[in-house]
């Protein structure tokens, strides 16, 4: 029997409400300035998952009235060509934010590409300058997924200060920035990765468990503390057509106090956080007369 007291962290519903607010703000801004925020999206290659994610972001832009410029590039594009495009976007006053859909082909140096983006247009929050500001608690663009996770927890009034948090996955995109946000919020944070000997040691003692590594059913119910907050950031496409996370959701909800579903949990919050960052970038650029 499912835990009747478990609360589903409904990212889709929250994202919908945030989108409504964004749409209203953009309408007001457009009426006042006759300008709209504009997101530049760069897609390299034909990876099915990347195409799906880009389409979701474009549709979200359309829903809130945000302009976008999509560049779909062949997989054999050179680094020099890609850098040239980013340079053009950096200097284009009509572009508020720049997003390079990851992963890039192996032939391209992802780190170099991300570092080429103007930090003031880095709405994904991946530029070293923005990551450094995050670590030192200075105002910066936060990576969209960690930002969405924190917003979701805040919405459900989940206390972070003084809590033990286990983060499974140490990527630059999710695990590392999320650990800094949790630390900045007053949590004691343990980050587990591929070399961690016993993940369950950390998860069993954690008040909040966040996982995003791309392995279905990695986190079992037996690995959780009763009443824990479980944030499933994983997205896995199974052969039978189902989309699942990294947590054994059916059994974990019998133990957890709060849990995100997959889909409709963290995913929608990631996209709406990207839109929020783009609007923030636009407003900053307008204040500077850019």
From Swiss-Prot:
Annotated PROSITE patterns: THF_DHG_CYH_1, THF_DHG_CYH_2
Record: residues binding NADP(+): 169-171, 194, 235
EC code(s) of this entry: 1.5.1.5, 3.5.4.9
Keyword Hydrolase tagged: yes
Pfam (any one): THF_DHG_CYH
Quaternary context: Homodimer.
Role this protein plays: Catalyzes the oxidation of 5,10-methylenetetrahydrofolate to 5,10-methenyltetrahydrofolate and then the hydrolysis of 5,10-methenyltetrahydrofolate to 10-formyltetrahydrofolate.
Family affiliation: Belongs to the tetrahydrofolate dehydrogenase/cyclohydrolase family.
Name this protein carries in UniProt: Bifunctional protein FolD
């Amino acid at each position: 029997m499912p835990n009747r007291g478990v609360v589903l962290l409904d990212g889709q519903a929250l994202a919908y409400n945030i989108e409504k607010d964004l749409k209203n703000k953009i309408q007001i801004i457009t009426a006042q300035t006759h300008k709209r925020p504009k997101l530049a999206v760069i897609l390299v290659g034909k990876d099915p998952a990347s195409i799906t994610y880009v389409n979701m972001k474009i549709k979200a832009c359309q829903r809130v009235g945000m302009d976008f410029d999509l560049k779909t590039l062949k997989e054999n594009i050179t680094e020099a060509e890609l850098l040239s495009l980013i340079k053009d976007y950096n200097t284009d006053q009509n572009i508020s934010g720049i997003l390079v859909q990851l992963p890039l082909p192996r032939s391209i140096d992802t780190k170099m590409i991300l570092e080429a983006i103007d930090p003031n247009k880095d709405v994904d929050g991946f530029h070293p300058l923005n990551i450094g500001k995050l670590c030192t608690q200075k105002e910066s663009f936060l990576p969209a997924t960690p930002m969405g996770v924190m917003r979701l927890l805040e919405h459900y009034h989940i206390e972070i200060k003084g809590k033990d948090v286990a983060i499974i996955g140490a990527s630059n995109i999710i695990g590392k920035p999320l650990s800094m946000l949790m630390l900045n919020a007053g949590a004691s944070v343990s980050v587990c990765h591929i070399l961690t000997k016993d993940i369950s040691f950390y998860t069993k003692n954690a008040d909040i468990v966040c996982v995003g590594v791309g392995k279905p059913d990695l986190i079992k119910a037996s690995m959780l503390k009763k009443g824990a907050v479980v944030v499933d950031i994983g997205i896995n496409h199974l052969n039978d057509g189902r989309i699942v996370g990294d947590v054994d959701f059916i059994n974990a909800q019998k133990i957890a106090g709060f849990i995100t579903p997959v889909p409709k949990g963290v995913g929608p919050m990631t996209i709406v956080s990207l839109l929020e960052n783009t609007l923030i970038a636009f407003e900053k650029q307008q204040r500077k007369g850019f």
